[in-house]
C-alpha cells in the first residue's frame, strides 16, 4: 500500500473483523435475523478489503524479490513488469474499496413498477 492512512484504515478493518468473528460466534445473534444479516454483510465487505490489502503486501514482497533476481538474471524482467501491473490494479482496487460508500447501498429496497 502507498499511504499511511490506508494502512491505518486496513488495520482498523482487521480489528473490526476480529470483533465480528467473535460476535458472529455468539448463538444469541441467530435469534436476531436483521442484526445477523447486517453483521455478515459487514464481515464479507471487510474480509474482501483485508484480502485485497494482503495481496498488495504479497505483491510488494514478490516484486522486490523479482527486481533483485533481475539484477542477476535479466529474464526476470517480464515477471517484474507483470507484478508491477498487477500491483497497480490491486492498489486501485484497494483505493476504491477504502473510499466511503453510501450506507443505504447495503439496505434492502422494495421497488414497485406500475404500468400505465
Q: What is each residue range found by the language model?
A:
Residues 1-109:
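Charged, heptad-repeat coiled-coil alpha-helices that serve as long linker/dimerization "arms"
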Residues 109-115:
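Short, hydrophobic beta-strand segments
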Amino acid at each position: 500500500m502507498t499511504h499511511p492512512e490506508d494502512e491505518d484504515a486496513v488495520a482498523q478493518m482487521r480489528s473490526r473483523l476480529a470483533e465480528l468473528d467473535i460476535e458472529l460466534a455468539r448463538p444469541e445473534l441467530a435469534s436476531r435475523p436483521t442484526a445477523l444479516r447486517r453483521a455478515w454483510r459487514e464481515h464479507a465487505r471487510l474480509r474482501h478489503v483485508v484480502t485485497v490489502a494482503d495481496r498488495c503486501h504479497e505483491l510488494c514482497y514478490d516484486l522486490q524479490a523479482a527486481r533483485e533476481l533481475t539484477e542477476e538474471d535479466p529474464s526476470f524482467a517480464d515477471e517484474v513488469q507483470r507484478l508491477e501491473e498487477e500491483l497497480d490494479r490491486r492498489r486501485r482496487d484497494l483505493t476504491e474499496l477504502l473510499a466511503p460508500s453510501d450506507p443505504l447501498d447495503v439496505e434492502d429496497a422494495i421497488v414497485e413498477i406500475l404500468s400505465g
